[in-house]
Amino acid sequence: MNKVIVVGGGAAGLLAAAAAAEHGAQVTVLEKMFKPGKKLLITGKGRCNITNDCDLQEIIKNIPGNGRFLNSALRQFTNEDVVKLLNDNGLETKVERGGRVFPVSDQAKDVVDTLLKILHDLGVELVTDICVTEVLTDTEKVIGVKTKSGKVFKADAVIVAAGGASYPGTGSDGSGFKLAEKLGHAIIPLKPSLVPLTSDSPYIPDLQGLSLRNVQATVYSSGSKAASEFGEMLFTHFGVSGPIILSLSKTVAALLKANKTNIDLLIDLKPALTFEKLEARVQRDFEQYSRKQLLNGMKDLLPQRLIPVVLDQAYLDEEKPVNQISKEERKRLVEVLKGLSVSITGTRPLAEAIVTAGGVSIKEIEPKTLRSKLWQGLYFAGEVIDIDGYTGGYNLQAAFSTGYVAGTAAAYQ
C-alpha cells in the first residue's frame, strides 16, 4: 500500500486525500491550522460557491490564468462529479443565478464537514497544527516531508496543496511556494487576483456601502479599453469591490505590473439603454419633475447618494431647476450616466485577494497527473499552481479537479 502525504487541508488537499485513499493509498493530511478548510469557510461570503453548472469549455474560458492547462484534470473530475460526490454523502446542493452551485443550507461549514466525513469514512489520517518546512528527496524522487518541529513523515508520494498567498490567516500564506522553490521549481511571480481596487476619486467616501446592480464596468488604460464586465459592484471606503470589480482586478493588476498608471474605470449605469433611449428617458423624467431642482428630478433614475456625484461629473448645478436644463446639458448628463468615471490607483494587498495569481509554473507539471516533471512522487494541486479564475465557482472547481487527479495519480506512484 502506497503512503501518500498531502500538505494542506483546503479544497484541493481534501479532495486529493479522498482520491488517494479511494484508490487504495494510506493517506495522511498535514494541515498547519488548528482546523482544515478554513479558507473554504469564507468562500462565497460564507456560503461556499462550490462550482459552476456549465460545460467544460465555459469553465476553461472563466479561468483566464492558464485554464487550458486544466483541460485534462477538468475532464477527469468534472463539476458534475463534485456535485455527485457531495450529494452522495448527504449534502444537498442548488443552482443559482449564473450557474453558481451552493449548498442548500447556504453554509460553507456543511461543505467542509461533508468533505471531512468522506475522509473519515476512507480512513484518512488528519494531523492539524503542524507546519511542513521541507519535502525530503533521495536522488530523483521524494521520500517524505519534514516539519517545523523536526518530525519526519515518510511517504512514497507527496502532494503539495498548501494554497496561495491570500488570506494568510486561513493558512494560505505562501508556504507551498517555498516548498516548491526549494525543490528547484520555478515560481511565477505572485500578484493578487479577485481583489478589490483602490481609488483616489474624491467622492468615494460619500458612496461607501452603495451597491449597484446591472451595471457595465470597463477598465481603460490611457484611453484604451482593456476589459469590461457586467453585473454587480460595491463602493467601499477605499475604492470599489463586488463581483465585476473582482473579475476586472486581474486586468488591473497586470496593467499596474506593466507600469501603466493612467487607469480609469467607466461605469455605464444604464447599459440596457442606448444613448438615445436613455436621453429620451431622462427627458421624460424632466418633464414629470419640471418644477423641481435637478437633485430631486433624478430620484427615479439613480440612488439618491449617487445623484450629486453624477451631476458633479456632468458639471451641473444640483440646485438648478429642471425646466432650465438645456439640451446640451442633458446630453452631458447622459454621457456621465453612460460612463461614470472612477480613477483607479491600485489593488488591495495580496493578503486580501480571494485568489493568488502566479505560483508553480505549469511548464514543470504534467497536466494529466499533476506530477512534477522534476521529481518522481511529487504532485501539486490547487492554488499553489499558476492558475486563477473569475468568481463563480471556477477556482474551487480547479482546486477540486486538480486535487482529485493528483490524489489518484499519487496512489499509484
Where are these regions (language model features)?
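N-terminal Rossmann-like FAD-binding beta1-loop-alpha1 element of flavoenzymes
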Residues: N2-V29, A406-A411
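Short hydrophobic core segments
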Residues: I5-V7, L30, V132, V145, ...
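Glycine-rich FAD pyrophosphate-binding loop
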Residues: A21-K45
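An anion/pyrophosphate-binding glycine-rich loop and adjacent beta-alpha core
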Residues: F34-P36, L41-I42, I50, L56-Q57, ...
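Glycine-rich active-site loop/strand segments that organize a redox cofactor
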Residues: R47-V95
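Feature captures the FAD/FMN-dependent oxidoreductase FAD-binding
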Residues: Q76-A157
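A glycine-rich dinucleotide-binding beta-alpha-beta segment and adjacent secondary-structure elements
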Residues: V127-I130, E134, P308-D388
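Glycine-rich loop(s) and the adjacent beta-strand/alpha-helix scaffold that form part
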Residues: F153, A157-Y203
